[in-house]
UniProtKB/Swiss-Prot annotation:
GO terms for biological process: tRNA wobble uridine modification. Belongs to the class I-like SAM-binding methyltransferase superfamily. Cx-SAM synthase family. It comes from the Bacteria. S-adenosyl-L-methionine binds at residues 35, 64-66, 88-89, 195. Catalyzes the conversion of S-adenosyl-L-methionine (SAM) to carboxy-S-adenosyl-L-methionine (Cx-SAM). Pfam families: Methyltransf_25 (PF13649). PANTHER family: CARBOXY-S-ADENOSYL-L-METHIONINE SYNTHASE, TRANS-ACONITATE 2-METHYLTRANSFERASE-RELATED. This is Carboxy-S-adenosyl-L-methionine synthase. InterPro entries: CmoA, Methyltransf_25, SAM-dependent_MTases_sf. It comes from Helicobacter pylori (strain G27). It catalyses: prephenate + S-adenosyl-L-methionine = carboxy-S-adenosyl-L-methionine + 3-phenylpyruvate + H2O. Its EC number is 2.1.3.-. Keywords: S-adenosyl-L-methionine, Transferase.
């Protein structure tokens, strides 16, 4: 269904409620440049990593899994038997995920705050456009938990909206992104109203800050495997 949520001001902060869940897939595709390409790219790196590190039944966590799109991409690229666990604190999102993946016997979903979850040892984790919604003071705590639960040679994928450390470049990047959204059919008002709703809810870091954060919790190998203006996909490997 087409995202028309921001035709008028919501007069409240953005949250992942039933109204958002109803149009979320359209919102993602029209708001994140190369969204599905990044999912496929992330699935590729996890699939290749699993080939290099054979486990009996690899466990993969998708934190902030929303409507389950990444699990679809993973199942298209990974042939071996895997266990997929999606965690999200929005029940409306998980209902959508369960509907879409009802035929996927290897996927299960849990409605929980992933900051409070005790993870099992896993071959891979994904945080796709999620860390930006975690309070800055809690990001290092979460990433350290992930690092400690990641198997040796395991991989973490982090997709993020980012900012530039240069004020002028940041302004130009934002303007280009708004032009992209207009080309996707969003009006000036819709863009402004959504920006207003996301104020202090989505807090982006720079690319350098995100990489430094991952390195601070123990990752020695972090690569930006994709970047478009103010969006990036990072792959971090535990060695």
């Amino acid at each position: 269904m087409k995202d028309t949520l921001f035709n008028q001001s919501l007069n409240k902060r953005f949250c992942f409620d039933e109204k958002v869940a109803h149009v979320f897939d359209d919102m993602l595709e029209r708001s994140i440049p190369y969204y599905y390409e990044m999912l496929d790219l992330g699935a590729y790196f996890i699939a290749q990593n699993l080939k290099e590190n054979l486990n009996a039944k690899p466990l993969i966590y998708d934190l902030g899994c929303s409507t389950g799109n990444f699990f679809i991409a993973l199942n298209q690229q990974i042939q071996q038997d895997i266990e997929l666990v999606g965690i999200d604190n929005s029940m409306p999102m998980l209902k959508k995920a369960q509907e879409k993946l009802k035929d996927f016997k290897n996927a299960r979903f849990e409605c929980m705050d992933f900051l409070e979850v005790e993870f099992k040892e896993a071959s891979a984790f994904s945080l796709l456009f999620v860390l930006q919604f975690v309070r800055p003071m809690q990001r290092e705590v979460l990433l350290k938990k992930i690092y400690n639960s990641l198997a040796l040679n395991g991989v973490l994928l982090v997709g993020e909206k980012i900012m530039s450390e240069d004020r002028i470049l940041d302004k130009q990047m934002i303007e280009l992104y708004y032009l992209y959204k207009q080309n996707q059919g969003y009006s000036h008002n819709e863009i402004a109203f959504k920006r207003e709703a996301l104020e202090n809810v989505l807090v982006p870091y720079s690319l350098k800050e995100n990489i430094a954060l991952l390195e601070s919790v123990g990752f020695k190998h972090v690569e930006a495997v994709f970047k478009w203006v103010n969006f990036t996909l990072l792959a971090a490997r535990k060695t």
